[in-house]
Regions:
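Mid-domain catalytic core of redox enzymes
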Residues: 2-4, 20-21, 104, 259-398, ...
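Short beta-strand to alpha-helix junction loop
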Residues: 76-83, 166-170, 181, 223-247, ...
Length: 502
C-alpha cells in the first residue's frame, strides 16, 4: 500500500447477464467477531475486506512461540452449550482439534482446611435428565456441608426460574441474590465463584445477576450435557489464525494484517470511506456500502462517525476486567489430570498444556502447566519475581509431586483488558449490532449478545452484525445458529436492526 491509494472493492462480481452478485463490505477487527462477520458476509455474496492491526488473527485468543513451545496467551475453554463457537470451529474446519469431554468431570482440590493436605472433590454429571444429572455429584461434594448442599439445590431451582433477559436482573449483583437464597460465603467460594469467576471474569459481588443467570441456567440447567467442557488440544493460533485465515481465503475475503483503520466517513454517494494505515507513510482508502466495526469498545468509540449512537460516550462506561496467566515448566510430570480447579489457594484453574505446546516431543520428561487466573485485579501488575514467589509454593501445596521438582521456566502473560466487566448495569450500556446510520454495524463480545465476554459471545456478535447488515441490504439470510440447521429467510425477519440508544 502506498500513500493516497484508494481501493474500491465495491466493483462487484457479476453473473453472466452482468448483474452484481454482491456489495462491498469492510470488517474492521480480526478477532472471532470480525472473522465470523466476514465469513457470513462473504458467504452471502459480498466482497469483503478484513482489516486487522496485529500481524495475526484471533484477537485475544492467540498463540506465540517461546523457545521450542507454542504458548497460548491464556487458557480458553468452551462448553457444549456454546453452539455458536462450535459452529465457528466447524466453519474453519477445526472441531476435531478442540474436542469436548464425553461427560462433565471437574476435579476440585481444596487445601484450605486445617490439615492442609489436598482434598479431592469432583463436579460431574450423570446420565440423567435435568436437574437430576448433577444431584449425585452435589450430594457427595466434600467441599460443602450437607446443609449447604441442600441449599444449593434450592437456589439452583430458583435460578432456573429466572429470565436472563429480564432487564431488572441487570441492576442486581449476583452475590446479593445468592445471599437472599441462603448461600453461605463458603458455598459462594466453593461452587458459585468456582464456576462464575472463570466464565464471567468477576466474583459474584461484581457480576450482574442477569449475566450470571445466563451462565448457570444455560450451562447447568438447560440440558444434561450443556456444561461439558471443551478446549483446544493444539495451539489456539492453529484455530483462530491459521485455519480462520484459510477459511477467509476460501470465502474470497481479502485479509489485510498489520493494517489499522484510522477513520470512517460518509462518501458522497451515501456509502462509506474507511481510511487505513499499514505502516509509516502508507495509507489506503476503501469504499464500501457496509462496514462492520469489530474492535473493543474504546477503539469503537474512537472510530464511530456522528449519529451512529445517541450517546456514544456510554461505550466508555463499559468497564474492563483483567486475566493473568502463569506458565510453569517442570522438569518432570507433576499432574496426571488434564486440568483441575483449586480452593483454599489463590490458584484458580490449572491445565496441562504439555502436548498442545509441542513440549512433549521436545522434552519427554518435562511438563508444562498453565495457571489461569480470572478477575485478577490484585495480581495483574505484580512483578514476575513476586508472582513466582507467590504461586510456586501454592502449586506445591496442591500438587505434592511438584515438591522438589525443578522449574525449567516460569513466565507470565497479562491481559489487562481481557474482557468487558460484567458489572450490574452493564446490560443497558451494550449496543445492538445495528447503529443509527445505515450501513454501519457493531460486533464484539461487548455488544448486546446476552452472553458474558466469551468466545461464544464474540461469535454470536459477528453473526448478529452480519445478519443486520444483510437485512439492511434486503438480502436473504440463512441464520447458521437457528435450530434445525437454520431456515432460509429474509434477514429482516431474522435480525431486525434497532436504532436509538446503545
Amino acid at each position: 500500500m502506498t500513500e493516497g491509494t484508494t481501493t474500491r472493492p465495491e466493483r462487484l462480481r457479476t453473473d453472466e447477464a452482468g448483474r452484481p452478485l454482491g456489495a462491498a463490505a469492510v470488517v474492521i477487527g480480526g478477532g472471532l467477531a470480525g472473522v465470523t462477520a466476514a465469513l457470513e458476509l462473504a458467504g452471502a455474496g459480498l466482497q469483503v475486506t478484513l482489516l486487522e492491526g496485529r500481524p495475526r488473527l484471533g484477537g485475544l485468543a492467540f498463540s506465540f512461540r517461546r523457545g521450542g513451545m507454542s504458548v497460548d496467551n491464556g487458557q480458553h475453554v468452551y462448553l457444549r452449550c456454546c453452539t455458536a463457537y462450535q459452529w465457528f470451529l466447524d466453519r474453519v474446519g477445526a472441531r476435531h482439534l478442540a474436542p469436548l469431554q464425553d461427560r462433565l468431570d471437574v476435579p476440585v482440590l481444596d487445601v484450605g482446611h486445617p490439615s492442609g493436605r489436598p482434598r479431592l472433590g469432583r463436579l460431574r454429571r450423570a446420565a440423567l435428565p435435568v436437574p437430576l444429572h448433577l444431584a449425585a455429584s452435589l450430594a457427595t461434594y466434600p467441599h460443602l456441608s450437607l446443609a449447604e448442599r441442600a441449599k444449593v439445590g434450592r437456589a439452583a431451582l430458583a435460578l432456573g426460574a429466572l429470565d436472563p433477559e429480564d432487564p431488572a436482573l441487570d441492576g442486581v449483583d449476583f452475590a446479593t441474590w445468592l445471599h437472599r437464597h441462603g448461600q453461605s460465603a463458603r458455598t459462594v467460594e466453593a461452587l458459585w465463584d468456582l464456576v462464575g469467576v472463570a466464565t464471567l471474569n468477576a466474583t459474584a459481588d461484581r457480576a450482574s445477576l442477569g449475566l450470571a443467570a445466563k451462565v448457570f441456567k444455560t450451562g447447568l440447567l438447560s440440558a444434561p450435557g450443556a456444561a461439558d467442557i471443551g478446549w483446544a488440544h493444539v495451539p489456539l493460533g492453529e484455530l483462530h489464525d491459521t485455519r480462520a485465515r484459510a477459511a477467509l481465503d476460501g470465502a474470497g475475503v481479502r485479509t489485510a494484517l498489520r493494517t489499522r483503520a484510522t477513520a470512517i466517513t460518509r462518501s458522497a454517494d451515501g456509502g462509506w470511506h474507511v481510511d487505513a494505515e499499514s505502516g509509516p507513510g502508507t495509507a489506503e482508502r476503501l469504499d464500501a456500502g457496509t462496514v462492520v466495526l469489530a474492535v473493543p469498545q474504546r477503539e469503537a468509540r474512537a472510530l464511530l462517525p456522528d449519529g451512529a449512537l445517541d450517546d456514544p460516550d456510554r461505550l466508555l462506561d463499559i468497564g474492563t476486567a483483567p486475566i493473568l496467566n502463569l506458565h510453569v515448566v517442570y522438569d518432570r510430570k507433576v499432574l496426571r489430570q488434564p486440568f483441575f480447579a483449586a480452593l483454599g489457594s489463590p490458584v484458580q484453574w490449572v491445565f496441562d498444556r504439555t502436548e498442545s505446546s509441542g513440549l512433549a516431543g521436545a522434552d519427554g520428561a518435562a511438563q508444562y502447566l498453565a495457571v489461569s487466573q480470572s478477575a485478577a485485579q490484585d495480581d495483574i501488575d505484580r512483578p514476575v519475581a513476586e508472582l513466582r514467589e507467590r504461586y510456586l509454593p501454592e502449586l506445591e501445596r496442591l500438587l505434592p509431586a511438584a515438591r522438589g521438582a525443578g522449574v525449567k521456566d516460569f513466565f507470565v502473560t497479562r491481559e489487562r483488558t481481557a474482557t468487558f466487566a460484567p458489572t450490574p448495569g452493564v446490560g443497558r450500556l451494550r449496543p445492538q449490532a445495528a447503529t443509527g446510520v445505515p450501513g454501519l454495524y457493531l460486533a464484539g463480545a461487548w455488544t448486546a449478545t446476552g452472553w458474558p465476554a466469551t468466545m461464544e459471545g464474540a461469535v454470536r456478535s459477528g453473526v448478529q452484525a452480519a445478519g443486520a447488515a444483510l437485512s439492511g441490504l434486503g438480502r436473504p439470510y440463512r441464520d447458521p445458529l437457528a435450530g434445525g440447521g437454520g431456515m432460509t429467510r429474509r434477514a429482516d425477519q431474522a435480525c431486525a436492526p434497532r436504532t436509538g440508544r446503545a
